[in-house]
From Swiss-Prot:
Annotated source species: Staphylococcus aureus (strain COL)
Major location category of this protein: cytoplasm
The organism's taxonomic lineage, starting at the top: Bacteria, Bacillati, Bacillota, Bacilli, Bacillales
Protein name from the UniProt record: Holo-[acyl-carrier-protein] synthase
Reaction catalysed by this enzyme: apo-[ACP] + CoA = holo-[ACP] + adenosine 3',5'-bisphosphate + H(+)
UniProt entry keywords in alphabetical sequence: Cytoplasm, Fatty acid biosynthesis, Fatty acid metabolism, Lipid biosynthesis, Lipid metabolism, Magnesium, Metal-binding, Transferase
UniProt: Mg(2+) binding residues: D8, E59
SUPFAM superfamilies per UniProt: 4'-phosphopantetheinyl transferase (SSF56214)
EC number of this enzyme: 2.7.8.7
Pfam families noted in UniProt: ACPS
């Protein structure tokens, strides 16, 4: 049974501007695992695209959950990783989480579908 669907779209330039002013933005948005992946990218633009994609994913996840970001769930509570095929995944107790992330030159977007787990 579907619990919720969330979608988020972010301008990559907006994330670039925030990152330029606040380098600690990475620590605020990304988990330790995500930070490790971020730091392994050699091209600065790819880092920003990754950061924007994860930002959009976490926003979309919180919308699907129905809480938004803040009191009930924070950026660092949501760890988005890639499986062996490269598919983005989020583990969250009680739910099966379906994630899609996409980028263009100017935008990053993510859609998250939360399905109640039968177990």
């Amino acid at each position: 049974m579907i619990h919720g669907i969330g979608v988020d779209l972010i301008e990559i330039d907006r994330i670039q501007a925030l990152y330029s002013k606040q380098p600690k933005l990475v620590e605020r948005i990304l988990t330790k695992n995500e930070q490790h992946k971020f730091n392994n990218f050699t091209h600065e633009q790819r880092k920003i695209e990754f950061l924007a994609g994860r930002f959009a994913t976490k926003e979309a996840f919180s919308k699907a959950l129905g809480t938004g970001l803040g009191k009930h769930v924070a950026f660092n509570d949501i760890d988005c990783y890639n499986d062996e095929l490269g598919k983005p995944k989020i583990d969250y107790e009680g739910f099966i989480v379906h994630v899609s992330i996409s980028h263009t030159e100017h935008y990053a977007m993510s859609q998250v579908v939360l399905e109640k787990s039968a177990f």
